[in-house]
Curated annotation (Swiss-Prot):
Keywords: Developmental protein, Differentiation, Phosphoprotein, Spermatogenesis
Oligomeric and partner information: Interacts with FANCL, GGNBP1 and ZNF403/GGNBP2.
Segments for region (Interactions with ZNF403/GGNBP2 and OAZ3): 496-658
Source organism of this protein record: Rattus norvegicus
Modified residues (Phosphoserine): 384
Extent of Basic residues compositional bias: 527-536
One biological process term in Gene Ontology: cell differentiation
Record-given protein name: Gametogenetin
InterPro entries reported in the protein's UniProt record: GGN
Biased composition (Basic and acidic residues): 14-30
PANTHER family per UniProt: GAMETOGENETIN (PTHR47742:SF1)
Amino acid sequence: MGNVQSEPSAGGGSRKEQASDRASDSRRTPLVEPEVTPSSPAMRLARGLGVWFPGSSGPPGLLIPPESQASSSTLPLTLELPSPVTPPPEEAAAAAVSTPPPPPVGTLLPAPSKWRKPTGTAVPRIRGLLEASHRGQGDPPSLRPLPPLPRQLTEKDPVLRAPAPPPTPLEPRKQLPPAPSTCDPQPPSRRITLASSATSPTESQVRHSSEGQAAGGAHGEGEMARSATSESGLSLLCKVTFKSGPHLSPTSSSGPLAAKASLGASGGGGLFASSGAISYAEVLKQGPQPPGATRPLGEGPRAAQETEGGDGDGEGCSGPPSVPTPLARALPPPPYTTFPGSKPKFDWVSPPDGTERHFRFNGAVGGIGAPRRRTTTLSGPWGSPPPRSGQTHPSSGPRRPTPALLAPPMFIFPAPNNGEPVRPVPPSPQQIPPLPPPPPTPPATPPPAPPPTPQPPALPRTPILVARPPTPGPGHLESALAPTPPSTLSPTAAAEQAPAPTPAPVTSQVPATTTAELSPPMPQPKIRTRRNKGPRAARGVIREEGTSGDGPREPNMAPVTDSSSGGGGGGSNGTSTAGASNKGTARHWPPFEVLNSCPCKCYCRHQRRHRRLPRNVSAWLSTPTNHLSEPPWVATVKLAGSLVAGLEHYDLQATHST
C-alpha cells in the first residue's frame, strides 16, 4: 500500500502513479509481461495476496469470481481491508484478499498505481515513496513514462497493469481508512469494466491482484496487451464492482481515466507517467464523470487535492467510476478546470474583473514602474476582492486613492470615450475647478466603461465615476479615484461608493482628479499622460514634486499634468496636447521637462560643478600642491612598506622609483 501511495512531489495523479511505478519496477519496463511474470515482485505480491494470474484458470483467493472476470457484469468485489491501516503491503493485500472488507477500491484501473491509494498507514506510504525514490521511480510520473499495466506496486498485484488498457476500468483508489468502508458500499453500479479488482486500503494490492487475476484470466498474458486489448473486454476480465457508492473518490473517476491514459500512452504507465498532469487532469475529469457513483462528500475536495497534486496522498478512497472511460473523460472535473490556472493567479485575476486588469495594463502598457507597484498594492484590495462595487471601493479606499493619485485612474477611464471629460477625473487637480461641474453629469452615465477600454491603461477601463464631481476639487478627485472600482457599478453607484473610500486619497489627488475631469479633448492626451505619470502618481503625489526638477512644482498639478511628460522626456512632448487641454498641465509639465533637462536639483554629469573631483582628490592630483604627485595614501603605503621591510631610511624618491 505504501508503495501505492503516490509521491507527494509528483503532481496530483503522478504521485500515485509514481508509487505504482516504484511498486512495479520490473513490471514497469515490460508493460505486458512484467505483471504476469511470476518472478516479478508484483507477481509474488499478487500471489501472496492470492491474486489470480492470467496463467491461473481462476483467481486463487480473489473475491472476483472467474465469472466476474469473464463477464462484464459488475461484480461487487468486496475486498475487505482488515483495517484502514494496511498491514505490510503484502500482508495487507493478503488480508484484503482473505477478508474482503466492504470497501473495495473503486477503480480497478490497472495502469497507474498513482490513482490507487493505499488506505493504509502513512508509514507504508512513505516507505513506498522512499523506495520509489531509490529506485529512481520517484521521478514525477509525468517525467518518466510508466506502463500503466505494471502500475501495481511491488506489493500491489502485478496483474492489473495490463487491464489498464480498458478505459472502463476504474483504477481503484485507495480510500483513506475511513473512506474504504464507504467506498465498499458502492453497489455494483460501480462495476469496473476494467479488468481490475477494486479493493480498499489493501485493496490497492488486492485490487492489483484481482486485476491481475481478471486481466490474466481474461487476457492471460493479454493483460500485458492491455492497451491492445479492447478496453471493454479488459474491463470484463476484472469486472470487479467496487461498491464505492459516493465514497468512490476522484479515484472512481480515475479508473477510466487511468485506463484511457494507459491506452493513450502505449505503455499505460507511460501515459500516466509521461503526462502526469494529463492523467491527473483526466482523473479529475473522470472523478466528476462517474455520476454512477456519487462522489463522496470528500470527493470534491479530493479532486481538488488531486488537481493540486494532493492526488497521491489525499485521496483516501479509490472509487472506481462505473462510468466508462468516455463518460468519465467527457466530464471535465471542476478541480481540473481550476488546475490549469494556478490558484493564486485565479484568485486575483479572476475576481477583479476590470480593476486588477486595469492596473496590470497600466504597468504593462505604461511600462512604468509605478503601475506595477500599483498593481501589487491594489492587488489585495482591487484584485483580490471581486466586488467592483462599493464593497471593493471601501476595502481598497485607502489604496485606491493611491491609484487615484496616480494619473492612471484619469487616463485609465478617459472621459473622452463617453465624450464626458468627467470620466477621466483622475487628471491633475488643475482641472478640479473647471471640471467639477462636468463630472457631475458624467456620473449619471455609466458608459465610461467603454472609454476606459480605449485608454491604454487597463485601470481606466473601469469608467471613472469621477462624476463624483460633487466636490469641485477633492470631490472630483475622489470621484476619479472611486470610478475605477465603481466602474462595475452603475456610474452613479460607483460615483457614490467611490467618494467615501476615495476622499482621503482624493484629497491629496483632488486637483489631479479634477484635471482628469477637465474636458473630453484632453482625455486622449491625458491617457498618455495619465499612463506615464500614473506610475509616478502611484509612487506618490509627493514624488511628483520631489522627483521633479523643481521642488516647488505643485504635487497635485504634476500628477495630473502630463503624466506622460513626467514619465519620459518624450512623454512631455506627447502630452503637450494634453497639457494644453489641461490648464494645469502647461505649468506642470515643465517640471517633468525640468527633470529631463536636469535643473541642477539632480546630481548629474551635465553640471560642471557635479563633474568636479572631490577637493581632496583634486588637491593631490594637482602637481603644484603635491610634490609627490601621488595620493597621500600612496605615500602612506610606501612608508608602511618600508617600515615592514625594516628599512632604516625611507627615501621617498627611492621608494617612488622603486
